[in-house]
């Protein structure tokens, strides 16, 4: 089970990151988006949360 999970992560995570870089050249890298979302504490304001979600998903 652990080996299967390790292989899955080793194969899919780099693929997702590479695809993110390839399709978002000149934009904020997806990894930085995820890091920013995890660092910024959730707030009661709807605006910043919606903005962060939009940026993270690549929608404009």
Swiss-Prot record:
<protein>
    <recommendedName>
        <fullName>Protein K12</fullName>
    </recommendedName>
</protein>
């Amino acid at each position: 089970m652990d080996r299967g999970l390790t292989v899955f992560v080793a194969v899919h995570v780099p693929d997702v990151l590479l695809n993110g870089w390839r399709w978002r050249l000149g934009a904020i890298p997806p990894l930085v988006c995820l890091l920013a979302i995890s660092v910024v504490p959730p707030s009661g304001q709807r605006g910043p949360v919606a903005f962060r979600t939009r940026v993270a998903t690549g929608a404009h």
